[in-house]
From Swiss-Prot:
It is found in: Cytoplasm; Nucleus. The keyword Protein biosynthesis does not apply. Its main location: cytoplasm. Transmembrane segments: none annotated. Carrier protein. Binds to some hydrophobic molecules and promotes their transfer between the different cellular sites. Binds with high affinity to alpha-tocopherol. Also binds with a weaker affinity to other tocopherols and to tocotrienols. May have a transcriptional activatory activity via its association with alpha-tocopherol. Probably recognizes and binds some squalene structure, suggesting that it may regulate cholesterol biosynthesis by increasing the transfer of squalene to a metabolic active pool in the cell. Residues 76-249 form the CRAL-TRIO domain. This is SEC14-like protein 2. InterPro entries: CRAL-TRIO_dom, CRAL-TRIO_dom_sf, CRAL/TRIO_N_dom, CRAL/TRIO_N_dom_sf, GOLD_dom, GOLD_dom_sf, SEC14/CRAL-TRIO_domain. It comes from the Eukaryota.
Amino acid sequence: MSGRVGDLSPRQKEALAKFRENVQDVLPALPNPDDYFLLRWLRARSFDLQKSEAMLRKHVEFRKQKDIDNIISWQPPEVIQQYLSGGMCGYDLDGCPVWYDIIGPLDAKGLLFSASKQDLLRTKMRECELLLQECAHQTTKLGRKVETITIIYDCEGLGLKHLWKPAVEAYGEFLCMFEENYPETLKRLFVVKAPKLFPVAYNLIKPFLSEDTRKKIMVLGANWKEVLLKHISPDQVPVEYGGTMTDPDGNPKCKSKINYGGDIPRKYYVRDQVKQQYEHSVQISRGSSHQVEYEILFPGCVLRWQFMSDGADVGFGIFLKTKMGERQRAGEMTEVLPNQRYNSHLVPEDGTLTCSDPGIYVLRFDNTYSFIHAKKVNFTVEVLLPDKASEEKMKQLGAGTPK
């Protein structure tokens, strides 16, 4: 049995009745605690009454703390309204709202430099509530329960800039919030136009997703427009995505409904860095350098680094070793990222590199040009691995061609 209204086993019916009894003290604090609502929490915890109750009570506290009942009337800051990409547009064949997430033009670093993380998370909460409100409108309009949403995840233009650690961490916080407070609301998620980098990006966010959510993610290949139209009527899909819907002025992207983001002008910036915690600290003597080595076992892995120096600039470059088991000078190795000096004492430096070859990569902090000052450098380096399942899926689909 699916655990949904009208499809409950005797054990599930008994669990529902007991669950309602156990949480009756908090039901008045919830917008519409009908059987559909309660079953979402039970399904999310496999009908474990104790875990379901703990999850729901935590959600009630979340609603109080974040003032969720009034969040739709809250207006996000101007920079978020103008540049946070995505939007609700159309309905699938079952009448469920469709949400578009547009990744490529999203300026994640600009958003975190221009708005507080709390305002960004609050905006995502507001979007969740707007989608649930739309589900309620559809329920009234169609005369049958609508309680889930379809998401189209447009990954065209997904690049290394989107792997910036503070942005991934902020997105992870949102995913945790979604999993904990909006269980069983995702019907399916279509990933379209996924580039070769997608398996690495997906592997970064996968830990924040429940197993059930992961099963609802469908990575589509070159025929993605045809697949979408099997689930959504053409008149409910923008021309940009293979349908016939346009804005009243004929715009094929339906920009009145979907925000396509873009680079954020620096006039919006309220900070030029995001506070970081670094894993390592090293003192580099004058006229010296410091090397850290990372083994890359197969192509497609991504090196991600962040560093800051105290008091003065420092050189940085990446090299590939030509001899194993011994320290090599920069001139003896293959240069991968040219060495240059960075003002990381003023603004922390960060970057990513897709490793096209396996081998030992050396990240070299250079202070050889300084004859007077030693440098203290704080840094974090990570090797980001691709998700093998999605990588294989993309190979099968031939979906790894877009750059």
